[in-house]
Amino acid sequence: MTTTQIIKPKRIAYYLRYCQNVHYFASIKPFLDYFISCGIHQNHVVVRRLAHGYQEIADYRGYTHLFTDDCDLVSYDLILTPTFLRDDEEGAQHLAVQIFHGMSDKPFTYQRNFSQYLLCLCAGQRQLDRLHSYECNHRMPATMVGYPKFDRIPANPPLYKNEKKAVIYCPTWRKGNMSSIELFLSNVDIIHVLAERYNLIVKPHPNIFNPEREFYESRIVAQLEQLPNIRLIRSGNVMGWFSQADLFVGDISASGYEWLYFNRPMVFLNPQPGVLKPSQDSNAWTYLWQCGPVCDNVRELPTLIANELNSDSYSDVRETVLHYSIFNPRGGTATQLAVAHILALLSSS
């Protein structure tokens, strides 16, 4: 005689906070897909306000029926969140699993107090080390699982159909004066040179397009949309576009850590020349900058790109940083490991 364990359905909140946080959605999507396929638990994509036209956002296609503005977080059995719970949401921390939406070098990610969370799922050792460098997180519940977005890279349609090399530029958002976007846009002649030589893809941080977020400026969006001979990408998951590119140009963008998966050349456009410099200190804002040359003068950007495409001398460094930053980066097991931890929490609640 065998007994079958009956699993009680639970209400799971996937908390994005802002409806247009497509990069947050990309980080919870592997878990959402898993629990939808199980057909047991109730899955709710929770936002504070359902933005006008959110049903038309390409990243949300097939999932919009799960969106809700029921933000009574303590009414859910478990919260999976790539955002960071704020002071007025502290009462929900004991239900929350932190799904880090990237591997940022920005310090304000790690200064937050995660000690009351159920669990923090970290991409790798670097993230753990940075979190533990703050006293408030010495006892935080955390484990390394890898980076779920690496498990299944989308097969996006080709942006170009020619033999040119492809360069992808990924500026971060404008918080803390860390973005190179305005420096880039103020040198239109350099953009024209790059667009003539290469297949130029521009994929800004999604917050640059989000009017609900601080530092949004419609003029920047308008300038981006008016750039000729480029492909402008609005997407929460850059991995499928990265697979089509030969070289990455970034600044303090966490997407650079995702680019490491491909081990292809990188160039960093310095948003604060003379102030920010490359560093091997894993707590530095510019730790990733050891993985490629830093451009302190935007006029030199075309030359640096050409040099790196012709002779890449940073491959070994990139691999070292990748394996320190991400547990088993190309093993395809991150989602599986993370889900096992989440299932254990669900069964104990």
Short names for language-model regions:
Residues H138-R139, A254-I326:
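Catalytic binding pocket for nucleotide-activated donors in carbohydrate/polymer assembly enzymes
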Residues D88-Q98, G236-P278:
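A donor-sugar binding/catalytic signature common to diverse glycosyltransferases
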Residues T4-N21, Y169:
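Nucleotide-activated donor-dependent transferases that construct or modify glycoconjugates
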Residues R330-S349:
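C-terminal alpha-helical cap of glycosyltransferases
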Residues A13-P154:
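Active-site and donor-binding regions of nucleotide-sugar-utilizing enzymes
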Residues Q20-C38, A142-V145, K149-I220, C295, ...:
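Conserved catalytic-core segment of nucleotide-activated headgroup transferases in glycan assembly
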Residues F67-C71, E214-Y257:
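Donor nucleotide-activated moiety binding/catalytic core segment of transferases
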Residues N43-D59, A195-R234:
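Catalytic donor nucleotide-activated moiety binding site of glycosyltransferases and closely related
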